[in-house]
Amino acid sequence: MFTRPLGRTSWQVSEIGYGMWGLAGWSGSDDTESLDSLHRSIALGCNFFDTAWGYGKGHSESILGRVVREHADKTLYVATKIPPKNFKWPSRKGFTLDECFPPEHIREYAEKSLENLGLPHIDLLQFHVWEDDWASDERWQRAMADLKEQGIVRAVGISVNRWEPDNVLKTLKTGLIDVVQVIFNIFDQAPRDRLFPLCEELNIGVIARVPFDEGTLTGTLTKESTWPSTDWRSTYFVPENLESSVDHAEALRPLIPSGMTMPELALRWILADSRVSTIIPGMRKRRNVEANTAVSDGKALDLGLLQQLKAHRWDRTPTAWSQ
């Protein structure tokens, strides 16, 4: 496993990190399987783990904390997120800081997450939604600074709303954000326009999430795919989105090099951008852990292929189903 610097932090994080939403928010979640996959990922060199209080109301955090404590001899980095006070994902323009992240709420959930994790500190604490209109509000700034000074939190980050990579630029310019997490994949290339150049200028770490476009870039979805009503994907892949997503994936298929899978192509495409610090695919099953971590081998995609993949950019705007 290769590592990359996480922005201005002193941390060298694994190119393939571990996204933990699926361990508590999707159908088929199984703690025994999740624990096995987490332990396997560590054995294969993964050292960066991204969770949130919102993933099972702290359940995902508890699973992660247990695993980290069992590997006390290793340097593992834990990232989690504060839910918005109104519990609405994503935030909307017009939402106020008081509705989402008043200072007392920031502290309350930092302490809840710390308790769930059972660790001495949180390496990276992120806001789970964000509106750039809050950039200059000193209340969140002081709240996070206090948590840092008290040793509860080591670094501060923002998880940018889906398909809104520019809705954080003013906040990054405050100099108070160490890491940004954003959707970035073969379809979602917009972060390259303005976000990545700014992150590079300010030495801000970049976490690439949703590398497989919620499953589209695994190449396994069909227009007949369905999910249980309890599975978040059942509300995301409405017919309008599912049909278009499958069409985009099928258009990509002829470009996949011989001997390579679509998920491997998706990960290698992201790694081709040196401004990305780590990718956090969801990995519930051991076989997916092994396949995804194997991509961190230093082998680059052909430049001609990278050029062709630019044409598969798919710009989308938030809708009622894209929470």
Pin down the residues of each PLM region.
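N-terminal binding-site loop/beta-alpha segment at the start of enzyme catalytic domains
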Residues: 1-76
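Surface-exposed, active-site-proximal loop segments in enzymatic domains
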Residues: 86-100
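Short, acidic/polar
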Residues: 29-41, 100-117, 162-171
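Conserved, mostly hydrophobic/aromatic
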Residues: 6, 18, 34, 41, ...
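A short, structured active-site edge motif that brings together acidic residues
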Residues: 74-87
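Active-site groove signature of glycoside hydrolases
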Residues: 114-133
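Beta/alpha (TIM)-barrel catalytic core signal, keyed to glycine-rich beta->alpha loops juxtaposed to Asp/Glu
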Residues: 57, 129-323
